[in-house]
Amino acid sequence: MTWLELQNNIRDLGFDDENPATMISSANRAINLIKKTLVEANKEYFRMIYEDEEWEPVSPTQITEETEDEFKIQIPDKLIDLVPLLAAHYAWLDDDIQKATMYWNEYDDLKNQLVADMVRPQNAEFWGGLGW
């Protein structure tokens, strides 16, 4: 997801462009929280799916007013759909607590589904054992 796509997603969730600083701040808060709570906590899972024992989460680059629209959000693809929901939660937090709560609930539901999928045992083969 690019910065432009994220902005469009946040707009689709009802937030307008009147205050770009709020959109930028909300996006940065969402990206940082997802990195700290989901990406780092599930490093082994991402190492496995990327088949890279050296995989480490990158520290996300902070979005600013100068950030190019084509800038790719630095969150693993599996978790990227969480970013607009959490950013919308933060964007609405001061103005409309009901909307903020609704987006938090949607974020939390999707997050729980993704976490359950990440901790579900992957395909495994068992070899050996005791013969009769």
Give the location of each predicted region:
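Conserved short "hinge" loops at termini or chain/domain junctions
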Residues: M1-K72, Q113-W132
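Structural motif
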Residues: K72-L82
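Short, hydrophobic/amphipathic alpha-helical patches that form generic packing surfaces
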Residues: D81-D94
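Charged, low-complexity interaction regions
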Residues: D95-T101
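Short, surface-exposed beta-strand/strand-loop-strand elements in extracellular ectodomains
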Residues: Y103-E106
